Structure formats: C-alpha cells, structure tokens
C-alpha cells in the first residue's frame, strides 16, 4: 500500500537508489497504490553517472510491497520492502535490468517487458 510521501527502493539499473511517491495516478482522489499501479516519483538518491539524476520526476510501476497482494486462492505474497521500476513517458522501463523478484500481477499488456527482465516471478 503506497501513498504520497512513501519512500521506495528502485528495483532497476536506471541509476536511482531511492524514490519518493509524489502522486498516485488513476483517479482524482486516489489514495493508495498496490502492485502493478503507476505512480509519480521523485528521485531522492541516485548513483553517480546514472541515467537519472536526483530531483527528477518520473513515472514508476510498483513491483513489490510490504503490504502484499492477495491471490484468488487466499494466499498472500508479501515482501520486506517496497520497490518500484522507473518508467519513461511511454511507460517503458528506463533501466535494462530488474533486481529482485516481481509478482505475477504485473502480467498485463503494459508490463510484459518487466516480467521478461525479472530474475524471478512469484
């Protein structure tokens, strides 16, 4: 469950380390985002010579949440930390690698690229 001001890990090699949610997209007063939702983020910490710089604003898709996602069979998939993958304006990943597992809930038309780059799909 991601809301405004939430700090997330960057799960890709775009150059960002930490990003902060500044808006949950999809609806005028939408409060929370879960796995697979698109959010606006500001880069709070970045590595030197990365593709992104501190202070820049990007779209991102949430790939892991500590709250978890409930499956139709009743099971819940949770993670230790919240993480997101940075996207460009065409909603394609900025990085070329994804770090850590992602959930099967990303298997939409939009995020098959992230699924194929991820080392593990839960």
Curated annotation (Swiss-Prot):
GO terms for cellular component: cytosolic large ribosomal subunit. Keywords: Ribonucleoprotein, Ribosomal protein, RNA-binding, rRNA-binding. It comes from the Bacteria. GO terms for molecular function: large ribosomal subunit rRNA binding; structural constituent of ribosome. Pfam families: Ribosomal_L14. PROSITE patterns: RIBOSOMAL_L14 (PS00049). One of its GO terms (biological process) is translation. Belongs to the universal ribosomal protein uL14 family. Part of the 50S ribosomal subunit. Forms a cluster with proteins L3 and L19. In the 70S ribosome, L14 and L19 interact and together make contacts with the 16S rRNA in bridges B5 and B8. Binds to 23S rRNA. Forms part of two intersubunit bridges in the 70S ribosome. This is Large ribosomal subunit protein uL14. It comes from Thioalkalivibrio sulfidiphilus (strain HL-EbGR7). The gene is rplN.
């Amino acid at each position: 469950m991601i809301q405004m001001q939430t700090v997330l890990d960057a799960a890709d090699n775009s150059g960002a380390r930490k990003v902060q949610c500044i808006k949950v997209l999809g609806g005028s007063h939408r409060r929370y985002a879960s796995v697979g939702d698109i959010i606006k983020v500001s880069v709070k910490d970045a590595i030197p010579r990365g593709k992104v710089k501190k202070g820049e604003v990007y779209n991102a898709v949430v790939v892991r949440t500590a709250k978890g996602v409930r499956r139709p069979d009743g099971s819940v998939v949770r993670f230790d930390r919240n993480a997101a993958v940075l996207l460009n304006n065409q909603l394609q990943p900025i990085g070329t690698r994804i770090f850590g597992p992602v959930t099967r809930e990303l298997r939409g038309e939009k995020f098959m690229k992230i699924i194929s780059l991820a080392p593990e799909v839960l």
